[in-house]
């Protein structure tokens, strides 16, 4: 609403590569896409250093963190195919390979035992700094929080999309009204006042909950 947020590339790491943003919120899996240089033009680029932080918590809130990632399932097939899939999953989650996959992809290892930075660094001493920093932060979050993942339910994908875009869509619409007010002579402070208040947030939240409840009732 104040003009400090931007999302023009496909991913926020793309916006960082072009100096369009200074910081972004992303998953640990995004660390493999972190740029080490910012390119402003064909003639100008410069190196950057990246710091990763745990997701913030609400004041007074509990120690919870959202966990999600790529899932694997075995669908109903022949006994031979089911056994082959089970063998693959068992191999895929074994310690040595799980850590190797984690380092190359940014995803965390499957087992609690393997979520150990001493073990990860010992097995992969040459991993990139961005990956090391991101995995270190992610492992810290796993060990210091109770993990939560959303359950599957009817219209769950629609609800997820609504949650993904509800705030950004509202902010874009409000920002447009702020720009129009400034063009008509209002100050920045006066133009944004009505859109950054507790009342505006409460109204947005109430509307969002109504829309989610409507989806859940279908």
Spans of features found by a protein language model:
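Conserved C-terminal helix/tail region of periplasmic/extracytoplasmic solute-binding proteins
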Residues: 139-218
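Short, contiguous acidic/charged loop-to-helix segments that flank catalytic cores in large enzymes
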Residues: 76-77, 119, 150-154
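Periplasmic-binding protein-like
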Residues: 91-117
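Extracytoplasmic/periplasmic substrate-binding proteins
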Residues: 1-87
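An extracytoplasmic/periplasmic, membrane-proximal ligand-sensing/linker region
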Residues: 113-148
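Sec/Tat-exported extracytoplasmic proteins
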Residues: 1-3, 20, 28, 35-38, ...
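Stable alpha-helical elements in mature extracytoplasmic
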Residues: 12, 30, 81-85, 97, ...
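Glycine-enriched catalytic-core subsegment of oxygenase/oxidase enzymes
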Residues: 65-68, 89, 99-101, 128
């Amino acid at each position: 609403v104040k003009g400090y947020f931007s999302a023009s590339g496909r991913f926020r790491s793309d916006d960082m590569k072009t100096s369009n943003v200074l910081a972004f919120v992303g998953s640990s899996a995004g660390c493999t896409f972190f740029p080490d240089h910012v390119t402003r033009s064909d003639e100008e680029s410069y190196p950057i250093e990246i710091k990763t932080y745990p997701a913030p918590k609400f004041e007074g809130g509990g120690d919870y963190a959202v966990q999600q990632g790529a899932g694997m399932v075995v669908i109903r097939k022949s006994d031979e195919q089911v056994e082959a899939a089970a063998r693959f999953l068992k191999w895929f989650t074994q310690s040595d390979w799980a850590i190797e996959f984690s380092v190359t992809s940014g995803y965390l290892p499957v087992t609690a035992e393997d979520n150990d930075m001493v073990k990860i660094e010992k097995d992969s001493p040459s991993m990139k700094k961005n990956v090391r920093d991101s995995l270190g932060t992610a492992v810290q979050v796993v060990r210091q929080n109770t993990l939560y993942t959303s359950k599957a339910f009817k219209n769950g994908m629609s609800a997820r999309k609504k949650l993904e875009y509800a705030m950004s869509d509202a902010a874009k619409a409000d920002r447009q009204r702020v720009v129009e007010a400034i063009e008509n002579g209002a100050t920045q402070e006066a133009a944004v006042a009505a859109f950054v208040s507790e009342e505006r947030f409460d109204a947005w939240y109430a509307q969002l909950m109504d829309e989610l409840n409507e989806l859940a009732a279908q």
